[in-house]
């Protein structure tokens, strides 16, 4: 339990930021799983590309703003690109 007023404020700020960060990471996880599910179910190419684009945008945004490490964002983008390319070749 914080003993000082400033420590209480930092605790409140930290809790708010933690919640916000978790929500952003959850959104990213949902987008990545959506792309994976669409590829697995052989969905329409346009639908897969749209989901892919939104996932890439989210990865870029979170990497630049340091919600996730930029290298992790880059790695995930690369994995998604490979997945999409293999999917497009197969069809």
Curated annotation (Swiss-Prot):
Biased composition (Basic and acidic residues): 1-21
Biased composition (Basic residues): 70-79
Statement: the UniProt record of this protein carries the keyword Amino-acid biosynthesis: no
A GO term for molecular function: structural constituent of ribosome
GO terms for cellular component: cytosol; small ribosomal subunit
Pfam families membership: Ribosomal_S20p (PF01649)
Disulfide cysteine pairs (residue numbers): none
BP-aspect Gene Ontology terms: translation
InterPro entries assigned to the protein according to its UniProt record, in alphabetical order: Ribosomal_bS20, Ribosomal_bS20_sf
Keyword line: Ribonucleoprotein, Ribosomal protein, RNA-binding, rRNA-binding
UniProt region (Disordered), positions on chain: 1-25, 70-91
Entry superkingdom: Bacteria
Record's function text: Binds directly to 16S ribosomal RNA.
Family: Belongs to the bacterial ribosomal protein bS20 family.
Name by which UniProt lists this protein: Small ribosomal subunit protein bS20
């Amino acid at each position: 339990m914080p003993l000082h007023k400033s420590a209480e404020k930092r605790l409140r700020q930290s809790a708010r930021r933690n919640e916000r960060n978790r929500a952003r990471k959850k959104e990213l996880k949902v987008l990545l799983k959506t792309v994976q599910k669409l590829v697995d179910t052989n969905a329409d190419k346009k639908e897969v590309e749209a989901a892919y684009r939104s996932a890439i945008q989210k990865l870029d945004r979170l990497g630049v703003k340091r919600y996730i490490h930029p290298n992790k964002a880059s790695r995930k983008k690369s994995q998604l690109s490979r997945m999409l390319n293999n999917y497009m070749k197969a069809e």
